[in-house]
Curated annotation (Swiss-Prot):
This is Exodeoxyribonuclease 7 large subunit. It comes from Histophilus somni (strain 129Pt). HAMAP family: Exonuc_7_L (MF_00378). Heterooligomer composed of large and small subunits. It catalyses: Exonucleolytic cleavage in either 5'- to 3'- or 3'- to 5'-direction to yield nucleoside 5'-phosphates.
């Protein structure tokens, strides 16, 4: 053993660690490595220290401050990353480690970063704006489904549509919903549905899956095809917790394919309830309409009665009777006052001690009586004359007298008497009052 030891090279710990480091750096050099970050720390120096691991192993890593400043994201535990590193050994402790030169997101982390970048770009262009959203048809007669023909999502949609609204026409646009061909096929089917115009609304979606599985619904081409679709589109991708770019661009986002089917279909009982409700509203509207027309007819009849010539004549007759009554009352009052004055004078004469004065006053009284009788006769005669003249004038002005001589009174629809042809237009209704009856006619021509 001592002989063997004399022939072997004996290393110190430092020499061994140095040799191992040189061997690692010389033989492996720079490597590319993917893994999940764990045990991440960042001391005040700014360097990053962490481990990269997979299901079976892990390795210590260091990324110095000047290098990690170039990384476009903040490293965190759980991130999947792709690193370029040098394999080395930390001699003081003999720890095998990687010195990281560059770092990029990998797997879902990279996809999530691309997702956020595209989301910001499309939002800045206004593709998510609410005023671009189209309303879903209130009663869809046909619905198009863009999805995998063999997927469970299609069966869920068809089952709900059949249960809720069997009369709804369904058109299936088969496409891949995962893989390299999915993006182009989805865009093609959206454009085909818009070209055919055989459906009222489109459902675009699939069942649940990983972010990578759902990635075709995060592609920019699919987002722009949804935005430019003239048919309203419901996105129904994955489960309620899955969010895709298609959800933001679509007119309506359904949390699941089943929920999308319920959005485009109306339950039969709901349709019957809606029909009954509208029937009630129609009946109420018709009742209000007829009541309004009846009230209008009653108002027109009342106005016609008020403007009838016989009504006007009755009013004039009442006014004449009132005037005659006032005249007779005035004359009676005048006579009573004169008689009272004469009685007073007679009493004064009877009480006078002077016969001559009595005789003289008697003569005056006789004269006054004669004058009074003469004046009263003139007054009554003049009053009778004036009364006869007024009655004759009133009778001559009576519309019925004019109508009795073969004349007529023509009025417009507002009840105004027509004096010339400029007060009416061709096509309007007019009413003609005769001595007996009214004729309603329509103006066909006018002459000056």
């Amino acid at each position: 053993m001592e002989q063997n030891m004399g022939q072997a090279k004996i290393y110190s710990v430092s020499q061994l660690n140095q040799s191992v480091r040189q061997m690692l750096e010389g033989q492996l050099g720079v490597v590319w490595l993917t893994g999940e970050i764990s045990n991440f720390t960042q001391p005040v120096s700014g360097h990053w220290y962490f481990s990269l691991k997979d299901e079976n192993a892990q390795v210590r890593c260091a990324m110095f401050r000047m290098k990690n400043m170039r990384v476009g994201f903040k490293a965190q535990n759980g991130m999947q990353v792709l690193v370029r590193a040098s394999v080395s050994l930390y001699e003081p402790r003999g720890d095998y480690q990687l010195i990281i030169e560059s770092m990029n997101l990998a797997g879902d982390g990279l996809l999530q970063r691309q997702f956020e970048a595209l989301k910001l770009t499309l939002a800045a262009e206004g593709l998510f704006a609410q005023h671009y959203k189209k309303n879903l048809p209130h009663f869809a007669k046909s619905v198009g489904i863009i999805t995998s023909p063999t997927g469970a999502a299609l069966q869920d949609i068809l089952h709900i549509l059949q249960r809720r609204d069997p009369s709804l026409h369904v058109v299936i646009y088969p496409t891949a919903v995962q893989g390299k061909e999915a993006t182009a096929e989805i865009v093609q089917m959206i454009e085909l549905a818009n070209k055919r115009r055989e459906v009222d609304v489109l459902i675009v979606g699939r069942g649940g899956g990983s972010l990578e599985d759902l990635w075709c619904f995060n592609e920019e081409r699919v987002a722009r095809a949804i935005f430019h679709s003239e048919l309203p589109i419901i996105s129904a991708v994955g489960h309620e917790t899955d969010v895709t770019i298609a959800d933001f661009v679509a007119d309506v986002r359904a949390p699941t394919p089943s929920a999308a089917a319920e959005l485009v279909s109306r339950h039969q009982q709901e349709l019957l309830d809606q029909l009954f409700y509208r029937k009630q509203r129609l009946e109420m509207a018709l009742d209000r309409f007829f009541q309004q027309k009846v009230k209008l007819l009653q108002r027109l009849q009342f106005r016609l009665q008020q403007q009838h010539p016989q009504s006007q004549l009755n009013i004039q007759q009442k006014m004449m009777q009132q005037l005659l009554h006032r005249l007779h009352l005035a004359l009676s009052t005048f006579v009573d006052k004169k008689q009272q004055k004469m009685t007073a004078l007679c009493r004064r004469l009877d009480n006078s001690p002077l016969p001559y004065y009595v005789q003289k006053q008697h003569q005056i009284l006789v004269q006054l009586e004669l004058r009074l009788n003469s004046g009263l006769q003139k007054k009554f005669k003049n009053a009778d004359y004036q009364l006869s003249r007024l009655c004759g004038k009133l009778d001559s002005l009576s519309p019925l007298k004019v109508l009795a001589r073969g004349y007529s009174i023509t009025k417009n629809q507002q009840g105004q008497a027509l004096k010339n042809s400029h007060q009416i237009e061709v096509g309007q209704l007019i009413s003609t009052q005769l001595e007996r009856g009214i004729i309603v006619s329509r103006v066909e021509a006018m002459e000056e």
